[in-house]
Amino acid sequence: MHELEVLLSRLKMEHLSYHVESLLEQAAKKELNYREFLCMALQQEWNGRHQRGMESRLKQARLPWVKTLEQFDFTFQPGIDRKVVRELAGLAFVERSENVILLGPPGVGKTHLAIALGVKAVDAGHRVLFMPLDRLIATLMKAKQENRLERQLQQLSYARVLILDEIGYLPMNREEASLFFRLLNRRYEKASIILTSNKGFADWGEMFGDHVLATAILDRLLHHSTTLNIKGESYRLKEKRKAGVLTKNTTPISDDEMVKSGQHQ
């Protein structure tokens, strides 16, 4: 190993060490001066570290898949204010510890937008965690039963952005709703939540099994927040119609009906 590679390794500049020979060749061909070469070399190291950090944060985020805002079909959901989405993509809401609430029926793109904003936050260096509500509640209930609730709440507070998906698909009892409130209260004005729900705010009292508690939950969520109410057709139904599985006159069973009939998985 050459002395230069040894020094770079000692400085823990692994990416630069790996590419240094090719960078030296480029510098010679382009006749770069010392400052230009140094900038190019440091940029190479930064790019490598950024990519490695993003891959690590994406893994820790537990996203079910990676979606971007560039992949979102705004033409299919023209009711969404693109200006608001662009502002959210700037992540000022994260810096201000504000929340984003995405409402709408199943399949309109709520989770896609939530994940895309999460990916933006990961790219910016923030710690993100994605959890469907049922998994969150199960995690909190187990922690409470094992007398480690405070520690679990603290662990969930480490995420700069917490994405809570599928609020409203299944009702909660009062104990579960109370645990949910404790989490919101812990994060209030300290870290951001991105939340998706198929229920309008008027239905949250029934959903949480306690209208007073639902009011307190909404108070914490809405105090500093941006709400997008998405009204439109389901992307999934559109694809099924394109494939000929459904006709335009077909009325598919809704997720709420599936829950009531016991068919929801």
Curated annotation (Swiss-Prot):
InterPro entries: AAA+_ATPase, ClpA/B, DNAC/IstB-like, IstB, IstB_ATP-bd, P-loop_NTPase
Keyword GTP-binding belongs to the record: no
Alphabetized SMART domains for the sequence: AAA (SM00382)
Keywords: ATP-binding, Nucleotide-binding, Plasmid, Transposable element
Short name of one Pfam family: IstB_IS21
Gene Ontology molecular function: any one: ATP hydrolysis activity
Chain sites annotated for binding ATP: 104-111
Gene Ontology BP, a term: DNA replication
Function according to Swiss-Prot or TrEMBL: One of two proteins expressed only when there is a tandem repeat of the IS21 insertion sequence, it is necessary for the transposition of plasmids with that tandem repeat.
Similarity comment: family membership: Belongs to the IS21/IS1162 putative ATP-binding protein family.
Protein name, as recorded: Insertion sequence IS21 putative ATP-binding protein
Species for this entry: Pseudomonas aeruginosa
Name of the gene: istB
